[in-house]
Amino acid sequence: MANAITFFKLNTGAKFPSVGLGTWQASPGLVGDAVAAAVKIGYRHIDCAQIYGNEKEIGAVLKKLFEDRVVKREDLFITSKLWCTDHDPQDVPEALNRTLKDLQLEYVDLYLIHWPARIKKGSVGIKPENLLPVDIPSTWKAMEALYDSGKARAIGVSNFSTKKLADLLELARVPPAVNQVECHPSWRQTKLQEFCKSKGVHLSAYSPLGSPGTTWLKSDVLKNPILNMVAEKLGKSPAQVALRWGLQMGHSVLPKSTNEGRIKENFNVFDWSIPDYMFAKFAEIEQARLVTGSFLVHETLSPYKSIEELWDGEI
């Protein structure tokens, strides 16, 4: 099964696995087993972030997988992300060093700016009074230095609108390799998809199933009638069809699960496809962004006065 996985090519030349394991909201105590199961099933990309609070546990499992020769380090693609409290240029290398220590790695394959937002250093949680003016150019220069050092084999961004990505591409010496954003049949990101393709930036989808396990998001992505009709006709689960849709759209997907059965099911998306006439039906699905980033918006204290401003109208 491991051989069945397909890859995308990044603008660095690196091979980027088309399906990865998301670890957002994967509880400590469960995430390690999920990572071990996923790697044994054939996953070759683990998507992490410092703010998820589970990198130490993932690091311990990775170490064991390497020691037991289940997989070689060079055959795994590991992503992590710079949190909003570490955007000051002097804090960027320290943040990556902490992540590398926790993950017990010498390098990450991809390091992303998690959000285009800055929060006061040392803040716990996100309070409006701790939001600071954003300076992406300075932060990006520090990211480029990490790329130069080899500690981050590729660098990129997450939650960037088309405009924010375009602004960054104007000034970047090392262009971002990836923009990781919410993307699923109920939030297709058509404009951003087209822009990324035109600029050689790979779009990677978090919440490709609409985060069904998340309590604070109202998500009906997997209940969509069109998705379910296609799933029934193809003899697949709605989750498999949502993931396969993403691959056929030309982007990678990062489904999160700590259930071994679902981890396996989510990986079984390579040896079949959605026929064109069914694929066309997805254009009829009503669109709604789930992760609005409202926690970064405040009418007086934030650089983003509205959700429209945070996403530059892409809502």
Swiss-Prot record:
Where would you say this protein principally sits, based on its record? plastid
Tell me the active site: 52
The listed locations are: Plastid, Chloroplast
Question: Which InterPro entries does the protein's record reference?
Answer: AKR, AKR4C, Aldo/ket_reductase_CS, NADP_OxRdtase_dom, NADP_OxRdtase_dom_sf
The enzyme's main class, written as a single word, is oxidoreductase
- What does induction of this protein depend on? By drought, salt and cold stresses.
PROSITE patterns found in the cross-reference section: ALDOKETO_REDUCTASE_1, ALDOKETO_REDUCTASE_2, ALDOKETO_REDUCTASE_3
| Residue(s) carrying N-acetylalanine | 2
UniProt xrefs under CDD domains? AKR_AKR4C1-15
Q: What is this enzyme's EC?
A: 1.1.1.-
Q: Which GO terms describe its biological process?
A: response to cold; response to salt stress; response to toxic substance; response to water deprivation
Question: What cellular-component terms does GO give this entry?
Answer: chloroplast; endoplasmic reticulum
* Coiled-coil boundaries: none
Q: Spell out the family assignment given in the record's similarity comment.
A: Belongs to the aldo/keto reductase family.
Q: What does this protein do?
A: Oxidoreductase acting on a broad range of substrates: reduces ketosteroids, aromatic aldehydes, ketones, sugars and other aliphatic aldehydes, and oxidizes hydroxysteroids. Aldehyde reductase that catalyzes the reduction of the aldehyde carbonyl groups on saturated and alpha,beta-unsaturated aldehydes. No activity on alpha,beta-unsaturated ketones. Can use propionaldehyde, butyraldehyde, methylglyoxal, (E)-2-pentenal, (E)-2-hexenal, (Z)-3-hexenal and (E)-2-nonenal as substrates, propenal (acrolein), crotonaldehyde, but not 2-butanone, 3-buten-2-one or 1-penten-3-one.
Q: What is this protein called?
A: NADPH-dependent aldo-keto reductase, chloroplastic
Q: What gene, per UniProt, encodes this protein?
A: AKR4C9
